[in-house]
Amino acid sequence: MPADLNMKVLVVDDMVTMRRIVKNILKQLGFGNVDEAENGQEALQKLRADTFGFVVSDWNMPVMTGIDMLRAIRADEKLKTLPVLMVTAEAQQSNLIEAVQAGVSNYIVKPFTAETMQEKIAKIFK
């Protein structure tokens, strides 16, 4: 099943530049309904208040990390099936294993290309 380009996507990163880059790539890929949050706590508030179809999140953020947000999403009855793509500088195998164990849908290591993001999203929604 291909991704629904009309679904609401949440981009979570404490760096405004990174949020802008990810949003621009998502728009290039056809996703027009993109919101953003600065950390996992803000993201969870938005996810619980609205209906999102997909989350793209950084790992290292203040207040609440992406991995802690992912665990909270998977523990939440309403949100637990929400696809989450982790986009992070954390390239160590132990980080990938931790993310997989926490229930990540897919994982991209920074820096990355639009093509890489497109491939990872396609795998999530196939």
Task: For the regions a language model picked out, list residue spans one by one.
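Short amphipathic alpha-helix used as the core "switch/output" element in two-component signaling
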Residues: Q45, I67-K80
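Helix N-cap/capping motif at the beta->alpha junctions
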Residues: E36-Q45, G66
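C-terminal output helix
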Residues: F112-I121
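Alpha4 helix (beta4-alpha4-beta5 surface) of REC/receiver domains from two-component response regulators
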Residues: K23, D68, A91-N106
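Receiver (REC) domain active-site loop signature in two-component systems and cognate sites
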Residues: M61
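Active-site beta3 strand of CheY-like receiver
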Residues: T51-V56
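Two-component/phosphorelay signaling modules centered on CheY-like receiver
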Residues: V16-D35
